[in-house]
Amino acid sequence: MIKRRQILLLIPLAAWLAVSLFRLNPSANALSGSASVDATPAALTPVETFTDADFTRHVEQLKKKLPSAGFTVVIQRPFVVIGDEPADVVKGHSEHTVKWAVDKLKQDFFAKDPNEILDIWLFKDSVSYEKNAQALFGERPATPYGYYSSTHRALIMNISTGGGTLVHEIVHPFIEANFPACPPWLNEGLGSLYEQSGEVAGHIHGYPNWRLPGLQRAIKAGNVPSFKTLTALDASGFYNEDKGTNYGQARYLCYYLQQHGLLVKFYREFYAHQKADRTGYQSLRKILGIADMNAFKKQWEKYVLTLTQGS
């Protein structure tokens, strides 16, 4: 049964070495009718980077800067969740969105928690979001939904728009900790894939979402770059040059891999060979088993044009 949800420092040296030398198990992602996935990608027990005492001290300092007494603070490892909705609602987001996403992402992709204790600020509406982002962080949000700020060690969300952006942004600090050299296309491709997600066979699963129509228009107009070009984009190129198409192409490449049982396998292959394959392009060719990537792009475009939003 498919369960859908709209969910728009010290470490002992030996343990550190074990994590740094770790290579992910290259088993494939599981979908109905495809190969099963191992219960966990990690070959060793995850290391607890921060202690209960670390979280307690963090929360004590955090409470000193709360904008008002109307905020609830919940420790949800590896994050601390802060929200100005009723306490039971904040706890619900913490358990059913944050914990769920963390558990599922770690199940298939990530062995390590983020490098720092990060705060997730869940503001109840656009007024609270804009006001408190300015008051707490000295900046006006560039998006009405939410964003991750590594500078402020925080995910800053307008939770009234739904939990999809929250799950998207949770991906980024995990990428930072586990795959620092990850190129923008995969970082944002994975993040945006899970903007609308649920579970299939107990694993996180992305569904077609609002990015689809724009990508389909770009395909029909012949404006989608080659996969070699997409994967080679640096941050400036990805975020500043035709940003919408880049996000859409990255998301639906990840979606295609997911639907063919190849996404987790690709991630682990790329992770294991990142020094020799900095863009992931060669790993992509290997996992697809395709030499002619121009022919694959045409096949992929036909596939994307058959998709419908919300299916």
Segments (PLM) and residue ranges:
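Acidic/His/Gly-enriched intrinsically disordered linker/tail segments
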Residues: 132-157, 180-311
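Juxtacatalytic substrate-recognition/specificity segment
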Residues: 44, 51, 58, 63-183, ...
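N-terminal low-structure segments adjacent to metalloprotease catalytic domains
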Residues: 1-74, 290-311
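Short, flexible segments with low predicted structural confidence
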Residues: 52-53, 162-163, 238, 255
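Short, charge-rich amphipathic segments
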Residues: 23-43, 60, 100-104, 122-125, ...
